[in-house]
A protein has these predicted regions:
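Conserved, single-site charged/polar hotspot
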Residues: 1-207
Length: 207
């Protein structure tokens, strides 16, 4: 509707936003733009829940996009340029799916979510990733073609850590976070030492 509507959001109330063309509301495909904390996202899938979250410094507004992990979420993940080699994109899709599954269902009150849409978990760009000029369809196709592929241990998805740079070698989880994960191993990563590929993060200091 036209105009502006003001809605008081009390501490015990959740405000849900739905739009046409989703699993939650029938109608033509619709895009919405959401601006939160100065960042604008274009969203196509799911629904949004707005809630007042208590923090040590007081209350703040949390906005959560509830989407289906298998496709709607993974289509919007932006952890790698979509023009990179297919094998790299396939590995990223499998790692992102595995990481998300390892966190799914574990509610975090600090964000009213299972997964942060930032580097705290995985960067979620939303529909903008899917409609990237020329290459957006490539990423969506990779996600679809690798559907169901995950990395597991004892039948459960591992926390599939990944990073853009490593300083030349990967690290053990116990050295980084204090708890052991036997599927993390120290291996050489020569690509991180290539000045042409990685000029900003070739040199690291261990502290």
């Amino acid at each position: 509707t036209l105009g502006k509507t003001t809605q008081v959001l009390t501490r015990s109330r959740t405000f849900t936003i739905r739009w046409a063309g989703t699993r939650y509301l029938e109608g033509p495909d619709t895009l919405i733009s959401v601006n939160h904390s100065g960042v604008t996202q274009r969203l196509r899938y799911g629904q949004i829940q707005v809630k007042a979250i208590k923090t040590p410094s007081g209350y703040r507004i949390a906005m959560t996009n509830s989407v289906r992990l298998a496709d709607e979420y993974l289509w919007g993940i932006s952890e790698m340029p979509s023009f990179w080699p297919v094998a790299a994109l396939e590995a990223q899709a499998i790692a992102s799916r595995t990481y998300a599954l390892s966190k799914a269902g574990i509610y975090r009150s600090a964000c009213d979510c299972d997964l942060y849409g930032s580097i705290s978990d995985q960067t979620f760009l939303g529909y903008a990733k899917e409609i990237e000029r020329k290459f957006g369809v490539v990423w969506k196709d990779i996600v679809t073609r690798t559907a169901g592929l995950t990395i597991t241990q004892a039948g459960l998805p591992i926390t599939a850590y990944f990073s853009s740079s490593s300083g030349g070698k990967t690290e053990l989880a116990v050295n980084a976070w204090g708890s052991s994960r036997d599927y993390t191993q120290i291996v050489d990563d020569p690509g991180s030492l290539d000045l042409a590929l990685n000029p900003r993060f070739v040199t690291w200091n261990r502290e």
